[in-house]
Amino acid sequence: MSDKRRTFAVIDGNSLMHRAFHAVPPTMNAPDGRPTNAIFGFLNMFLKMIDAFNPDGVVVAFDKGKPRVRMEMLPQYKAQRPPMDPDLHAQFPMIKELLAALNVPILQSEGWEGDDILGTMARLGEQAGCDMLLVTGDRDMYQLVTEHVNVVSTRKGLSDVAIMTPESVDDLYHGITPALVPDFYGLKGDTSDNIPGVPGIGPKKASALIAQYGSLDEVIAHADEVKGKMGENLRAHIDDALLSRKVATIRTDAPVELDFEATSFPAFSADEVSAALGTLGITAMQNRFLALIGGEGGAAASTFEIPAVLRAAAGDAGALGAVAAEVSRVIDAGEWVAAVVDDDKEEGALFGLTRTLWLATSKGLFALEEGDSGAAAEVEGFNFAHGVIAGVLARLFMEGRVASPDMKALLHELSPIDSSELELMDPLAVDSTRIFDTVVAAYLLDSDRSEFDEVYLADTYLQMALPAARGAEGAGEDAPAPAARTAALTLALVAPLRDRMARENAANVFDGIEMPLVPVLAKMERAGMLVDPDRLHSLSEGLATQIADVERSIRDLAGDETFNIGSPMQLSHVLFDVMGLPTKGLKKTKRGYYSTNAKVLSDLARDHEIVRLILDWREKSKIKSTYLDTLGPLRRGDGRVHTTYNQTITATGRLSSSDPNLQNIPTRSELGRTVKTAFSAGEGSVFLAVDYSQIELRLLAHLSGDEHLVRAFNEGEDFHAETAARVFGVPVSEVTPDLRSRAKAVNFGIVYGQQAYGLSQSLHISMAEARDMIDRYYEAYPGVRTFLDNVVARAKQTGYAETMYGRRRHIPELKAKNPQLRGFGERTAMNHPMQGTAADIIKIAMARVSRRLEEEGFAAHMILQVHDELDFECPVDEVERLTTMVRDVMEHVVDLRVPLIAEASTGITWADAK
């Protein structure tokens, strides 16, 4: 593309709206309850496109009505597609109103698809001397690519894009030029659009045939030369191939037009855009849009300024002294300093050996470089024996106030995850009141959010736009290093995040629970868990044999020796088309086949042996691939696996585990237990597991104050049997195991806000019976009904539910018009006070136990947290003392109307400890 020509972006509105709708969780709503997740995702992609390409003009094309143009050629065109989701359909008029406020032309014509409008605009723009960018997720648009027409292809989610040029199209299709893309689809077809193509010819074969013969016409002319089944299909479906090519060809004669000279972007009123965004409740993007017009007509966001940098290499005594002096100054002044370690290769760093510690203070940015070039200069007050980065961080952690977007990772600079590496500082030596994790703070303020990227943080808490970092699209020659920008932004965020937490009652949770937990998690991650690779290998081989046996049984029952059991599409075909299993009530996927998800198969398993075997095959295959084959390679130099604990993932406040995820090993299946036999304690030690008993039910008793519930726990009764007696009207002595099991399901279902449908599914009973059981439960425990009703009413009024400690969970679904979403919001509001409080309690217990382990000189280590359970690696001679201490801490975290009970067990392996 030429730099001298004007650039226009033409956006495929339907494609981006669909992609955004499925990429952004359905938890966003306008103040009036209308869903806005697709709009939010669309606008996010829109802004990223503007930032990356800075087009001179933007237009958006939409489908209008049925695709008459192609349906006239192929009546079944797109006929298999399910109706558009009502929540997505409702957002199209809203996005069009917003685009009108942005003064972005909307192009559509009755009976024409957006694809053809993009094609028409591509050719019109090219003729007008413009460079054209077609923003779409449809690969068939690659046929339009020329020297002056590129496709910005949206792929996974909203952030992964590819710029398709003639060269990249040729590379993708192995020698097929853009003009031959319709020929490719003529052979391959397109299942998403119901374009038939030639049966049995997939993308690789289609590319190979066209590359060999030069075009579809030549492939057809030489059809007799194509051997085997593929040749038979080709010769039998020549008409289908020609029709498919015609249908797949993008039209360039749609009845739309645009005055390219008179169209420009941005050219909107700040007031109109602010009002439109405010109406939809999407205020977080307001400043990003207003920044595009530099404040004309409204108060636009300023650009975040990156301070000048003082750079110091390890051997540069003068510069190093200046940085050290600034570190000493901020420590003495009690100021916050942001610290970010950059492992990326800086420009000029030989083979990427230079590591840089970026520090942001009130005076500016400072970069400490550390390489292999020699010892650091001596500076008073600092110990650089292990490098300048370690020396500066050690002093900051011990004496200063440190901010970071990933405090735990920063602690691992001095306390490496691999325990075979030298530890320079015990994380527990850090005063948690002097550390500030900006991402944890942002998470507490919006725990339902999945990402806390820097653009979002700057926009939300500083009302500023971030300059592009070095290496990003559109970055200038003087763009800051990514880590430099991160450090500067982190320091700037401390004050506004602290202010917002104070206003929203989140400071106590941040200061009293989350920050004290950070050093504890760092220490646990370093401790790791000992795993036996030989045991893993043996288990994997044994399971592989079992999987092969199950596969043979499945294929025998199916009468098909070739189908891929792991393919949902092929499995669906075998079960429902070939074997004729019932499909009543089943939904089809977007690709047109019946779902084979776990829920569907579980319902069918009761009556069909093959389905039971498939579920068994899936469980065994998952255990083998996820754990038995993966854990061994994850061992570090100390022979241990070291999971990462995440504080900002779950909306409830619970910790999650990753790389590897040790919390998700199945606890109730024999296979899950088998995996745990590979984890052992060190020589002379055992596993100690201490688990809260029924903590969420005990919290329900405390929070509801129901006298019968409180009495049952205080008197130490079998709570589930007591519930069964009250609900089913029989003496406790006559409660059968089945009645107790049903009562247990109701007890835990109530905690999670379960309604009649959910209970009927879990107990395999009718809706009427489930509804009657729930009604009788509330009659038995009337205080619970009153409490839950009040929780939901309060959440609808405030927009959030909260824990005993003030941890809030915002629940926008409570305002949704969709009854299913609204029901989810109500169940979430009911559950959060119990589940969220349980998460708070276990976190407080972890911090207290960790301190006492240090203070009382235990050799034992806390090595794992799984929901309501803490696990320890404990020398045999400490088991009794440690058990007493841990139970004492866990049972006295908080005073409730009912006792908290912690139960302990031990074993040589993790499996034995339960």
Regions found by a protein language model. Give the residues of each.
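Extended two-metal-dependent nuclease catalytic cores across DNA- and RNA-processing enzymes
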Residues: 2-4, 26-29, 79-256
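Conserved RNase H-like, two-metal-ion catalytic cores of nucleic-acid enzymes
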Residues: 6-9, 19-59, 75-76, 80-87, ...
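Short alpha-helix plus adjacent loop in nuclease-associated cores
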Residues: 76-90, 141, 146-175, 231-233, ...
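Acidic, Mg2+-coordinating catalytic module of metal-dependent nucleases/exonucleases
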Residues: 184-219, 462-539, 743-748, 753-758, ...
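Conserved "right-hand" nucleotidyltransferase catalytic core of DNA-directed polymerases
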Residues: 237-380, 485-667, 686, 696, ...
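Function-dense linear segments that define catalytic or interfacial modules
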Residues: 360, 445-468, 482-490, 647-732
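Conserved catalytic core of nucleic-acid polymerases
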Residues: 523-526, 635-636, 642-643, 647-650, ...
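C-terminal polymerase-core module
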Residues: 545-552, 556, 560-609, 779-827, ...
